[in-house]
């Protein structure tokens, strides 16, 4: 894990007894953070924003948690999972403080979104760490995914010129966007996440062959829904994102 290289201590906000630095100095180094509470892990990324320059990543951290395993089988987050997540986020908060992070965005996706005790969980996160976590829906996930790859798409003329299918496979869902000349015209979120499908397969009774048939039928039904909503056959190129996609590649 990397540590701050150019800090003697945590940054502080100006007080009545200290003068604020010039605007140019303030803009030259602005550490910000994003936190992602996913189905199988919680992740932190800290970057430094400099006016007119691309973000410089300072720190990345990830901790495995079982939010999806709990939410997708029992519908609620278990005590052990909540405690493990709190410990991870508490550690992330200390890392953020060491960089002097003031601005951040923390989001939770399908696992927390579907848990019946999500409000209790979010309250505990706020009390324990001081972090305010925002539960986002599928449309916001798609928007953030597109925003993240938009600049990269512009560097590939073939992807911008034609029709491209953008797919992000997460633990709880798969987010699909159909891009025409680099702009999204269709998008949707579907229950095809790796953790969700694995938990569903384990919960079904019967022989291995019977469970495989049920699994395939379930996937086929979801794919039919996707085809009704998104013109898959028109896509000339495909772009897959996410840890599971990288593993398959």
How would you label these PLM feature ranges?
Residues 40:
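Primarily the dimerization/phosphotransfer
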Residues 1-37, 45-169, 177-249:
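Nucleotide/phosphate-binding catalytic cleft detector across ATP-hydrolyzing
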């Amino acid at each position: 894990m990397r540590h701050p290289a150019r800090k003697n201590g945590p940054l502080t906000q100006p007080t009545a007894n200290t003068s604020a630095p010039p605007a140019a100095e303030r803009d030259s180094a602005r550490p910000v953070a994003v936190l992602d509470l996913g189905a199988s892990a919680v992740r932190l990324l800290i970057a430094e924003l400099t006016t007119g320059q691309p973000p410089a990543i300072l720190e990345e951290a990830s901790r495995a948690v079982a939010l999806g395993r709990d939410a997708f089988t029992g519908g609620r987050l278990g005590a052990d999972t909540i405690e493990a997540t709190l410990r991870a986020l508490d550690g992330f908060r200390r890392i953020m403080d060491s960089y002097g992070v003031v601005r951040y965005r923390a989001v939770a996706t399908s696992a927390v979104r579907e848990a019946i005790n999500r409000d209790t969980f979010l309250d505990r996160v706020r009390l324990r760490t001081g972090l305010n976590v925002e539960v986002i829906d599928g449309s916001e996930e798609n928007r953030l995914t597109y925003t993240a790859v938009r600049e990269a798409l512009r560097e590939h003329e073939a992807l911008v010129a034609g029709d491209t299918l953008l797919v992000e496979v997460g633990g709880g869902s798969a987010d699909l966007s159909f891009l025409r000349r680099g702009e999204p015209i269709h998008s949707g979120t579907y229950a095809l996440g790796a953790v969700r499908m694995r938990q569903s397969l384990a919960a079904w009774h019967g022989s291995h062959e019977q469970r495989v048939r049920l699994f395939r039928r379930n996937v086929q039904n979801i794919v039919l829904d996707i085809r009704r909503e998104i013109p898959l056959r028109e896509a000339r190129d495909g772009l897959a994102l996410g840890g599971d996609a990288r593993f398959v590649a």
